[in-house]
Regions:
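N-terminal localization/anchoring segments of enzymes in phospholipid and broader phosphate metabolism
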Residues: 1-196
Length: 196
């Protein structure tokens, strides 16, 4: 709960936080730079001068142009052949051999299918999972809630420190707790995920 309270407070304070860097165009007059530094309380070592464009998010406007000849084909993650058109259970496949899914290259659908099957399977007693960037209306959360409502033991470590997704993760963590899922938030100062 301490970590949850700390993250909720950090989110509230985010809009009032101090500037951590100031990016300026190389042609900006020194007096304007000095006014900005003074008003934003930024030291000179936190000022970055660039001769390129500022605010790179505006480059998305180029992506919105209807020019398919200038774009890569949309990427579609693959589903391993052994998990396509399952006539039987996903558990039957897993009894035959282990599977390694490499996201985002492999589809996340088999993971959702596994959780949904586990939620309904009377032989499954518990589901334990770590959640990082949960997203909006996530089928994973729906499957975990269903499992809990089917009297399964469900435990989830929810990574609250998913930068700019904290509010979403807090919402879904509380939603899981509301149906009786045991939710842990990790440890202060320690992330529970990695990027490979």
């Amino acid at each position: 709960d301490d970590l949850l309270l700390m993250m909720e407070d950090n989110i509230r304070q985010r809009h009032f936080g101090s500037a951590v860097r100031l990016e300026i165009d190389g042609d900006m007059p020194a007096d304007v730079r000095d006014i900005l530094m003074s008003n934003l309380q930024v030291d000179s070592y936190d000022v970055y001068t660039t001769n390129g464009p500022l605010g790179l998010s505006s480059l998305w406007e180029l992506h919105r142009l209807e020019r398919p000849d200038l774009k890569d084909r949309p990427f579609s993650p693959r589903t391993p052949a052994s998990l396509q058109n399952l006539g039987g259970s996903v558990f039957a496949v897993l009894r035959q051999r282990d599977l390694l899914l490499h996201h985002p290259y492999d589809s996340f659908t088999p993971v959702v299918n596994l959780l949904e099957a586990a939620a309904d399977d009377p032989d499954v007693l518990a589901i334990k999972i770590t959640l990082y960037r949960v997203g909006s209306n996530p089928p994973v959360v729906q499957a975990l809630k269903k499992a809990r409502l089917n009297n399964k033991q469900v435990a989830a470590v929810v990574e609250l420190k998913a930068r700019f997704d904290e509010e979403t993760n807090i919402h879904w963590a509380q939603e899981l707790e509301s149906v009786g899922v045991h939710v842990a938030y990790g440890l202060i100062g320690l992330k529970t995920h990695c990027k490979v």
